[in-house]
């Protein structure tokens, strides 16, 4: 357990693994691919309601995480895709807020401290500003209902009426969240790239992350999704690809693996071929260990 940091350096790299058969299986699957971080769904992501977690499942999950050395700060649960915390219709908004609070409660029961979610969509029925304010209020309500868990906003590709693709959207939400200690950001490299922030070269990465720091603040970065993109720059389309096989290329992922600003947070693959996740993790880790050796 104690040797994980020594073996893997300061980077916590994994993938979004299946929780089929119970959430307690997720840490086992993560370890099979050589991960020291992972993401999961704590319930079926395409259903509104799930039966409560059983005590034996909660205990088994915690025991497996402890046995394999996974800390809560390196586990990134993702909420249901159905939830829209900026929904313009009251009924959908109330349903989304109740479901989000349930997701946060499940994280708390499992001893987890992060909950990753897509911010929301205005559906062309309200202004961007109104939608962003509604999202922030949804986070505030969840914070009041459930302790400990940090709401981690994922930037989006900008498809349709989804908000969160501009760094300014993220900053505007955070600005209206009352408890700043319990809000953060997960940057998805594919989404960032297709939203119009270039990542193809080291210089592009320097510029994009400097812009994120200026607008949002690097101290809010709690996690990353490492994905290449099947579609071209600034296309506003979300299509993930395996690392180095898409439009972004390896330079970006080498940059992240070598930059200490991305130490200590979950770096999660959502790439399209689970058969090569271990290979992708090993390549990222090799870049990181090289940097440590040369520093």
Curated annotation (Swiss-Prot):
Residues engaged in binding Zn(2+) 1: 78, 118, 154
Tell me which UniProt keywords the record has, alphabetically: DNA damage, DNA repair, Endonuclease, Hydrolase, Metal-binding, Nuclease, Zinc
Reactions catalysed, as given in the entry:
Endonucleolytic cleavage to 5'-phosphooligonucleotide end-products
The entry's Zn(2+) 2-binding residues are 154, 188, 225, 270
The cofactor required is: Zn(2+)
Which InterPro entries does the annotation name? AP_endonuc_2, AP_endonuc_F2_Zn_BS, Xyl_isomerase-like_sf, Xyl_isomerase-like_TIM-brl
Q: Which residues form a coiled coil?
A: none
As for family, the record states: Belongs to the AP endonuclease 2 family.
**Protein name per the record:** Probable endonuclease 4
What organism is listed for this UniProt entry? Vibrio campbellii (strain ATCC BAA-1116)
Upper lineage is: Bacteria, Pseudomonadati, Pseudomonadota, Gammaproteobacteria, Vibrionales
Which gene is annotated as encoding this protein in its UniProt record?
A: nfo
């Amino acid at each position: 357990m104690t040797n994980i940091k020594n073996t893997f350096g300061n980077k916590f790299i994994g993938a979004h693994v299946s929780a089929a058969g119970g959430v307690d299986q997720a840490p086992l699957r993560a370890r099979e691919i050589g991960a020291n971080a992972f993401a999961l769904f704590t319930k079926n992501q395409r259903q509104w309601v799930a039966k409560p977690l059983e005590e034996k499942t909660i205990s088994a999950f915690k025991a497996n995480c402890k046995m394999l050395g996974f800390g809560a700060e390196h586990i990134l649960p993702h909420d249901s895709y159905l939830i829209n915390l900026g929904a313009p219709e009251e009924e959908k908004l109330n349903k989304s807020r109740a479901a989000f609070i349930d997701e946060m409660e499940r994280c708390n029961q499992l001893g987890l401290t992060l909950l990753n979610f897509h911010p929301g969509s205005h559906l062309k029925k309200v202004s961007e500003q109104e939608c962003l304010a509604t999202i922030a209020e949804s986070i505030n309500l969840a914070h009041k209902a459930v302790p400990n868990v940090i709401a981690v906003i994922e930037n989006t590709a900008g498809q349709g009426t989804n908000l969160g693709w501009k760094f300014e959207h993220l900053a505007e939400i955070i600005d209206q969240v009352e408890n700043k200690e319990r809000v953060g950001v997960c940057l998805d490299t594919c989404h960032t790239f297709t939203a119009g922030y270039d990542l193809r070269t080291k210089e592009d990465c320097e510029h994009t992350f400097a812009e994120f720091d200026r607008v949002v603040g690097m101290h809010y970065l709690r996690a990353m999704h490492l994905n290449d993109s099947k579609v071209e720059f600034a296309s506003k389309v979300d299509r993930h690809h395996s690392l180095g096989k898409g439009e972004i290329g390896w330079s970006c992922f080498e940059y992240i693996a070598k930059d200490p600003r991305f130490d200590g947070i979950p770096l999660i693959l959502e790439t399209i071929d689970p058969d090569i996740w271990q290979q992708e993790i090993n390549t990222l880790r090799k870049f990181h260990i090289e940097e440590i050796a040369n520093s």
